[in-house]
Amino acid sequence: MITVRTIPELRAAIAAHPGAGRPGKRPAFVPTMGNLHDGHIALVRQARPLGDVLVASIFVNRLQFLPHEDFDSYPRTWEADCAKLEAAGCDIVFAPRESDLYPEPQTFKLQPDPQLADILEGHFRPGFFTGVCTVVMKLFSAVFFASGGGTAVFGKKDYQQLMVIRRMVQQFALPVEVVAGETARADDGLALSSRNGYLSTAERVQAVQLSAALRALAQAAQAPGAPPLAALEQQALQTLAQQGWAPDYLTVRQRHDLQPPAAGAAAGTLVALGAARLGSTRLIDNLEF
């Protein structure tokens, strides 16, 4: 496994790799912000057979953090991350410095569809998906430029992000196949997240309540004669608040566009999504049903 810092170095490393540079040979790519856990590594292992050279990026993207969020304190665990990536079969780690990826102010930014990107996470974190789309487009350009395309793996844990990236790829006719990876969970059901490390011991025990709330909401929505979704969502919010959380949203949406479902929406087409703060830690999760 090799590590590169700049876009020219990355493109040269991909071209020089034995699995690339031949007709029909394409990269597989997993973008990360580092501080890797088993969920990230599952995505890397999933990507391994999907390309001829496997690239993972480590970059904490300032553009997707609000001023009051944890950009400066976000854990940087470089040596441990590289060891995990190498063990998972990664060929190239692209770890640009901010000056490498943004050598000048990024005045051109992608503005995603507000119907998809200004709801849910985008409502509570304004500008988040502009930052995500801008950096992902730049990473796609860096990784897939020479090959003319390839495969990128994104986790369902960040469900709305996955939908936004898929829409971006479709809208710009990018030669990238976006593959979804299932959410990795701890034994008690908590979705693995880099921010779980912010939880105290007591909060970590309590944190499973978010996934339990989503499961209960999904079950209630499918019950015969269920009340209107708005009433079920309000009840779920109240229950989580009574348990000591500060919830942003708990809601049921259509999977394909994250809009409220039509009456009688078929099972297998919906997703329950939630975001809530426990102490100082904001967690998100989702459950397809």
UniProtKB/Swiss-Prot annotation:
One of its GO terms (cellular component) is cytosol. ATP binds at residues 33-40, 155-158, 184, 192-195. (R)-pantoate binds at Q64, Q161. The keyword ATP-binding applies. Its EC number is 6.3.2.1. Beta-alanine binds at Q64. It is found in: Cytoplasm. Catalyzes the condensation of pantoate with beta-alanine in an ATP-dependent reaction via a pantoyl-adenylate intermediate. This is Pantothenate synthetase.
